[in-house]
């Protein structure tokens, strides 16, 4: 884990994604262990707490050393995971906001609609816009090359609005 994290940081990563999968059993302990391990070994690197297990995200936040930056909740969307915006807001965390609902947005109009919904939800809960990082959801480049320019346009639209973006 440490070797892989160092490789990512050496390559220019600005945060590390701590993906423990669904981790239904022992997820809370696993996330706590991973957060402590990475924060003890790397200075000033924010960590993205990535799991569908909400209790594991909360456990990671509970041991997070904020002198190394804010924790990042990965992720919320405009459908079944919108409550992760509330979780991030309640814990003064950043949230990766996926610009989708029940499925991938079909075009930038739909992406921007989801972006607006997510931004409004965060701001209603007291979040700064800078604490929402919008992910337009990159599609498989090989299979859907015609959609990639739209994704790049969406990133520019986020930037033009003063919003942060990310992608994975």
Q: What spans do the regions from the language model cover?
A:
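Acidic (Asp/Glu)-rich catalytic clusters
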Residues: 9-10, 61-68, 82-93, 124-127, ...
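Gly-rich Lys/Arg/Thr-decorated short loops/hinges at beta-loop-alpha junctions or inter-strand turns
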Residues: 1, 9-20, 39-42, 66-69, ...
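Catalytic alpha/beta core domains of metabolic enzymes, predominantly
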Residues: 90-168
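Active-site mouth loops of central-metabolism enzymes
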Residues: 1-5, 27, 72-78, 102-110
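Glycine-rich, proline-tolerant flexible connector loops at the mouths of alpha/beta enzymes
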Residues: 9-45, 138-145
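Alpha-helix-loop-beta-strand connector modules within alpha/beta enzyme cores
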Residues: 26-68, 152-165
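Short, acidic/polar
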Residues: 2-8, 81, 117
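Catalytic beta/alpha-barrel core
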Residues: 17-22, 45-53, 70-80, 99, ...
């Amino acid at each position: 884990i440490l070797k892989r994290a160092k490789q990512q940081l050496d390559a220019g990563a600005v945060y590390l994604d701590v993906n423990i999968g669904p981790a239904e059993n022992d997820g809370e302990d696993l996330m706590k262990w991973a957060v402590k391990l990475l924060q003890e070994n790397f200075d000033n690197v924010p960590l993205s707490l990535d799991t569908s297990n909400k209790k594991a995200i909360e456990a990671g936040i509970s041991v997070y050393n904020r002198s190394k930056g804010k924790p990042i909740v990965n992720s919320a969307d405009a459908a079944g995971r919108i409550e992760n915006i509330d979780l991030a807001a309640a814990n003064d965390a950043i949230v990766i906001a996926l610009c989708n609902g029940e499925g991938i947005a079909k075009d930038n109009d739909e992406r921007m609609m989801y972006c607006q919904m997510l931004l409004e939800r965060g701001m209603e809960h007291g979040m700064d816009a800078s604490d929402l990082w919008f992910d337009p959801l990159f599609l498989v480049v090989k299979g859907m090359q015609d959609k990639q320019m739209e994704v790049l346009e969406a990133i520019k639209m986020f930037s033009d609005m003063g919003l942060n973006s990310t992608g994975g």
